[in-house]
């Protein structure tokens, strides 16, 4: 059962907040900036209003998740810190003496209350609305790019991830006491998961039995991470796989297993739209949705800045549309057009590797320019794929001809739209605007380094979208506070 609204706690100790939580405290400023009643309004229909025991306020539960994102800590740690950190209690709307929730409630809140809702667009729209009200968004330019996030199960096998977490814990212990090595259990040197699980349990048992070690904040944080990893490995045992994650390519020689978050950001560094896809998806096809969503969220878009991945023929035509067009500042690449293929047969261009990726996720192994340079017909760029992969591919029907000795994908170099874009690309105006693209690279780095967005916290596309929504909301709110 859900209470009509979150009630302010009455306590004789509430005056403590005026003493220990200063006016310039980050969490106090966020509380003053954001009216969190929108969370209640969005989630009210997820609760029963007249049956069952009274549920924890959805606003408070949402704030727990926001704290977890801002400080990049685990469920256990955010609840534990809320027990003694007065700024956390103030932010959560708790009385100083009030007890905290059980950390497992956060997992239930994510699964039962936040599923089946467009949390990403809801939170971005709210933060953009606040930025517009504060007069922070002044430009009509957005910068687009994609950032990758490693899946939770990648790139390690169960043994490797256990060893990594154990190593991180031991490193903190060694920093406290060099002689502690003698008391720790012997490392497992065999490539056997059962033995590694036994070693991990022995290590956890030893550390948790010594309060002088387990209660040290740095040790406790690593200890909780190892516990979560152990629990996850035991649930999946020999396999820990994310069914929604896919292999994407950062460069021609390096790849990752996970997801991509496609971001549109204003010139003032406020994220105005975002979509999350599996790792193999191309950047260019997301441009239309990013522009539309930015406009829907209240951003006026006249100019779009992006790298070569966004200068495909479809995007060039979109930019020239009379009603919904914009100035596209994106350098041409001779290999960006999909030609005449159907949507389901399109190959995506990976700007980092400089190669095309087929619908099945396989990247070309080499490329060659074909045709006469000064001939009657335009030259084409031909991409060659690994024929052995094509022979066993589940999507080979209609794509690979049985018995063929090669599989290629060719595209014409420079069409009419590209010719016009090339002329604009040579102008000083293009060069001046393009210099602003560095801002989104800095934003991507901030999301990963400050908010831990380099690694997925859960499995599946839904979990990744939820993580992205909370991360972007936190980043936007902190940016608004900085510019206010």
Where are these regions (language model features)?
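A ubiquitous short alpha-helical element
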Residues: 1, 47-51, 428-432
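Charged, often Cys/His-bearing segments associated with DNA-binding zinc-finger transcription factors
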Residues: 1-34, 41, 396-419
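Short secondary-structure transition/capping motifs
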Residues: 19, 32, 53-57, 67, ...
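Basic, short loop/linker segments at the boundary and entry of helix-turn-helix/winged-helix-like folds
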Residues: 26-66, 71
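Contiguous, well-ordered alpha-helical segments that form the cores/surfaces of helical PPI scaffolds
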Residues: 58-69, 84-88, 261-262, 289-292
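Anion-binding and metal-coordination hotspots
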Residues: 74-77, 82, 98-99, 107-484
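Short, positively charged loop/turn segments that connect secondary-structure elements
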Residues: 87-105
């Amino acid at each position: 059962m859900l209470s009509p609204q979150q009630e302010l706690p009455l306590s004789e100790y509430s005056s403590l907040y005026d003493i220990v939580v200063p006016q310039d405290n980050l969490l106090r400023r966020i509380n003053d900036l954001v009216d969190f009643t929108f969370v209640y309004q969005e989630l009210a229909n997820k609760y029963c209003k007249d049956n069952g025991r009274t549920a924890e306020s959805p606003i408070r539960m949402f704030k727990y998740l926001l704290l977890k994102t801002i400080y990049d800590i685990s469920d256990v740690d955010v609840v534990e810190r809320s027990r003694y950190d007065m700024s956390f209690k103030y932010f959560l709307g708790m009385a100083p003496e009030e007890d905290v929730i059980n950390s497992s409630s956060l997992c239930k809140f994510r699964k039962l209350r936040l599923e089946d809702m467009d949390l990403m667009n809801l939170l971005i729209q709210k933060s953009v609305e606040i930025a517009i009200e504060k007069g922070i968004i002044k430009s009509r330019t957005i910068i687009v790019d994609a950032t990758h996030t490693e899946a939770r199960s990648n790139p390690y096998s169960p043994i490797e991830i256990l060893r990594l977490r154990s190593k991180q814990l031991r490193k903190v212990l060694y920093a406290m006491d060099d002689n502690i090595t003698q008391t720790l259990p012997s490392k497992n040197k065999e490539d056997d998961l059962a033995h590694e699980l036994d070693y991990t349990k022995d290590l956890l048992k030893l550390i948790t039995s010594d309060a002088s070690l387990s209660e040290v904040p740095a040790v406790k944080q690593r200890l909780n991470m190892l516990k979560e990893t152990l629990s996850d490995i035991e649930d999946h045992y020999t396999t820990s796989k994310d069914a929604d994650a896919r292999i994407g390519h950062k460069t021609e020689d390096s790849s990752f297993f996970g997801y991509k978050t496609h971001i549109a950001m204003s010139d003032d560094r406020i994220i105005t739209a975002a979509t999350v896809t599996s790792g193999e998806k191309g950047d260019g096809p997301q441009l239309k949705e990013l522009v539309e969503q930015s406009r829907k969220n209240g951003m006026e878009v006249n100019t779009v800045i992006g790298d070569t991945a966004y200068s495909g023929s479809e995007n060039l035509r979109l930019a020239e549309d009379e009603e919904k067009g914009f100035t596209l500042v994106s350098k041409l690449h001779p290999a960006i057009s999909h030609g005449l293929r159907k949507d389901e047969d399109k190959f995506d261009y990976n700007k980092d590797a400089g190669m095309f990726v087929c619908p099945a996720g396989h990247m070309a192994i080499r490329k060659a320019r074909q045709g006469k340079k000064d001939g009657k017909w335009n030259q084409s760029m031909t991409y060659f794929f690994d024929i052995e992969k094509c022979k066993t591919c589940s999507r080979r029907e209609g794509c690979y001809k049985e018995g063929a000795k090669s599989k290629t994908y060719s595209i014409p170099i420079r069409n009419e739209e590209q010719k016009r874009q090339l002329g604009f690309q040579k102008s000083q105006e293009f060069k001046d605007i393009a210099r602003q693209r560095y801002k989104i690279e800095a934003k991507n780095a901030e999301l990963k380094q400050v908010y831990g967005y380099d690694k997925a916290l859960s499995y599946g596309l839904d979990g990744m979208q939820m993580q992205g929504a909370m991360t972007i909301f936190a980043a936007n709110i902190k940016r608004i506070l900085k510019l206010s």
